[in-house]
């Protein structure tokens, strides 16, 4: 299976990436079948060989998640929402709701506790 992935190069902490087509079992920085583009995350510079990318995609090449997002931004493929992403977003939303409910409960309990403390201190005077 042919994968479209990012091949890292550059200095330490100054990485740049080449968008390459390679065999799915090859190493990340191994020899690619074809170089299809360039991406620099620091400057957000992206260069894509659109004709070659369309050819590879029509042949059945599978892009990785990072490459898929670059291709979506470049307008080569439509933005897709996969079922796993939908489920993950639902779980995240539920987690946020439960966390906010817990925070509200803690605040109300703290305020009730401080009211009781202030009442006991005023009645003791």
Swiss-Prot record:
Keyword Membrane: no
Region Disordered: start-end pairs: 87-125
Domain of life: Bacteria
Key words of the record: Ribonucleoprotein, Ribosomal protein
Secretion signal, residue range per the UniProt entry: none
Ranges annotated as biased composition (Basic and acidic residues): 103-115
One of the GO biological process terms: translation
InterPro entries, A to Z: Ribosomal_bS16, Ribosomal_bS16_CS, Ribosomal_bS16_dom_sf
Keyword Ribosomal protein: yes
Pfam families xref list: Ribosomal_S16
Gene Ontology cellular-component terms listed: cytoplasm; small ribosomal subunit
GO molecular function terms attached to this record: structural constituent of ribosome
Disulfide bond annotation, renumbered to this chain: none
Matches recorded under SUPFAM superfamilies: Ribosomal protein S16 (SSF54565)
UniProt-listed NCBIfam families: S16
HAMAP family: Ribosomal_bS16
Family label: Belongs to the bacterial ribosomal protein bS16 family.
Protein name: Small ribosomal subunit protein bS16
Organism for this UniProt entry: Prochlorococcus marinus (strain MIT 9211)
Lineage: Bacteria, Bacillati, Cyanobacteriota, Cyanophyceae, Synechococcales
Originating gene: rpsP
């Amino acid at each position: 299976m042919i994968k479209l992935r990012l091949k890292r190069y550059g200095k330490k902490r100054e990485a740049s990436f080449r968008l390459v087509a390679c065999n799915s079992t090859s190493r990340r920085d191994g020899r690619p079948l074809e170089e299809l583009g360039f991406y620099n995350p620091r400057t957000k510079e992206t260069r894509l060989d659109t004709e070659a990318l369309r050819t590879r995609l029509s042949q059945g090449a599978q892009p990785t998640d990072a490459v898929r997002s670059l291709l979506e931004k470049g307008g080569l493929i439509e933005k897709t929402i996969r079922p796993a992403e939908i489920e993950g977003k639902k779980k995240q939303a539920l987690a946020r709701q439960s966390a906010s409910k817990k925070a509200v409960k803690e605040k109300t309990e703290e305020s009730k506790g401080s009211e009781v403390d202030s009442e006991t201190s005023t009645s003791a005077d």
